[in-house]
């Protein structure tokens, strides 16, 4: 998906450094989500080994130093990954504002290496995640390359935008007061952890439904151009690439649904599609669904 070049990027809620403290667990997307939790706690595997098997080559992918001064227009979002992440956050905010009365924007932080959060310290091995304490979505953009080289995703800009929309989906859950369910009997293919992540996938699909029609208030220009078939394929590939079953099979050679916390590849694809086809966040009630797919 390509941003319209006339869109103006708002970086006012985005930072690239800072610290915090706390003890609550951050909530991950499962494809950007807290891989430390998914891999290490559930599978008994060092996440550092998984994420560092291949070197990253982002020379033509990231402008150096997370320089947000380069993020001015949609053209910059199409060129630089950090600008694309910020612009996607702008788009997701614009979509949710009319859908959820009282919606407030989350903060966004771009980081590399180590970062302090309201949920405690984190590292680049964590990947993108959302912390409900400071209401901030954290993104290490190197993860998008890892998603391709380590997990077999097809990549593409819309796969990256989907990850952002998923983490913002956790913010929506936080505003609705349902995010805490992730900590209640979190494991298992039908557990609350899986239901929480699948709902965030569905919310990402809802964003995709509106992404090319919702206009920026200040310019009157839609944030994004219409979705292509490849965009959807890239999002579905990203969702599937780090489904619990895919990660377990890759890491241990077997799958164990009793330890799932994020959902299978098929489940994640299903719920993104549900949101994308309907544009109705009420359909995303995974907590009441008898069949998660």
From Swiss-Prot:
Q: How does it sit in the membrane?
A: Single-pass membrane protein
Q: Does the keyword Transcription regulation apply?
A: no
**Pfam families documented for this protein:** Zn_peptidase
Its subcellular locations are:
Membrane
Q: Which coarse location class applies to the principal site listed for this UniProt protein?
A: membrane
Q: Which GO terms describe its cellular component?
A: extracellular region; membrane
Q: Where is this region: Disordered?
A: 1-22, 243-265
Give start-end positions of Polar residues composition bias: 248-265
Looking up InterPro entries in the UniProt record yields: Uncharacterised_pept_Zn_put
Q: Where is the signal peptide?
A: none
Task: Show the stretches that span the lipid bilayer.
Answer: 25-45
Q: Could you identify this protein by its name? A: Uncharacterized protein Rv2575
Question: Which organism does this record belong to?
Answer: Mycobacterium tuberculosis (strain ATCC 25618 / H37Rv)
């Amino acid at each position: 998906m390509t941003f319209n070049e006339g869109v103006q990027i708002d970086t006012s809620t985005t930072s690239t450094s800072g610290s915090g403290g706390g003890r609550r667990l951050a909530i991950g997307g499962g494809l950007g989500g807290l891989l430390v939790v998914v891999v290490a706690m559930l599978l008994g595997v060092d996440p550092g080994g998984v994420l560092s098997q291949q070197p990253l080559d982002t020379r033509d992918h990231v402008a150096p130093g997370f320089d947000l001064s380069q993020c001015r227009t949609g053209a910059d979002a199409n060129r630089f990954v950090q600008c694309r992440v910020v612009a996607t956050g702008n788009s997701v905010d614009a979509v949710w504002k009319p859908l959820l009365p009282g919606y407030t924007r989350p903060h966004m932080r771009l980081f590399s290496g180590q970062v302090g959060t309201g949920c405690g310290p984190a590292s680049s091995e964590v990947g993108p995640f959302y912390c409900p304490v400071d209401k901030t979505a954290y993104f290490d953009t190197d993860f998008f390359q890892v998603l391709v080289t380590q997990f077999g995703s097809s990549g593409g800009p819309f796969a990256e935008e989907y990850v952002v929309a998923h983490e913002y989906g956790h913010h929506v859950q936080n505003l609705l007061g349902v995010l805490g369910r992730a900590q209640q009997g979190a494991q298992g293919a039908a557990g609350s952890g899986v239901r929480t992540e699948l709902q965030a996938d569905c919310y990402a699909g809802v964003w995709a439904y509106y992404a090319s029609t919702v206009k920026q208030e200040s310019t009157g220009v839609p944030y994004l151009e219409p979705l292509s078939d490849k965009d959807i394929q890239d999002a579905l590939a990203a969702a599937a690439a780090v489904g619990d079953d895919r990660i377990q099979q890759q890491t241990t050679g077997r799958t164990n649904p009793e330890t799932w916390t994020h959902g299978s590849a098929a489940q994640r694809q299903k719920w993104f599609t549900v949101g994308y086809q309907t544009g109705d966040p009420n359909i995303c009630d995974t907590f009441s669904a008898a069949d998660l797919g």
